[in-house]
Amino acid sequence: MKIAITGHKRGIGNEFAKQLSDRGHHIVGISRSDGENIRRVAHTASLIEPCDLFINNAISMYAQTELLFEVWHRWQPYKDVHHIWNISTKVCEWDKDAQIPGLTMRESMEYRNQKMSLELAHFQLEAQASNTKMMLIRPGQVKTWKHSDENATPVDRYVSEVLSQQELV
């Protein structure tokens, strides 16, 4: 299977790329460190369009949501089944005034609002008849380069658990 992953160089995106590659899947990695920018929505969507699965992981303002719409609409004419996994956050379940550890209140609200935008778009598209199958993934505290809380789930274990629940060809 050909799989596009935004933000594949660090954190959860990197772990998805590693584990899926180890399972024999071809990874199309899209990352700022490779000179890509998901804010260039049409260009990024053109890299994703030939793939079977899009793991929509990277966040850059509201580009993650814009990219979801763009890819979903590009895949509509196809009869083949495609998949989009949107990586959101459990923070969307929190009280709107909750502060994320390590972020200011303003940064916490911006992050939550961007992910809520993604979730609303996800539910809107998921409700429509389509050959594009959607999955929303809401990680809680996952131990990555950015989050090192001792109570957090190790990123390799978290991704392994997500993948064990999926049927990938």
Model-derived segments and their meaning:
Residues 2-5, 54-55, 84:
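Conserved hydrophobic beta-strands of the Rossmann-like cofactor-binding core
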Residues 59, 63, 73-128, 140-145:
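Catalytic loop of short-chain dehydrogenase/reductase
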Residues 4-23:
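N-terminal Rossmann NAD(P)H-binding glycine-rich loop of SDR-like oxidoreductase domains
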Residues 50-51, 81:
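Local beta-strand N-terminus motif with an aromatic residue
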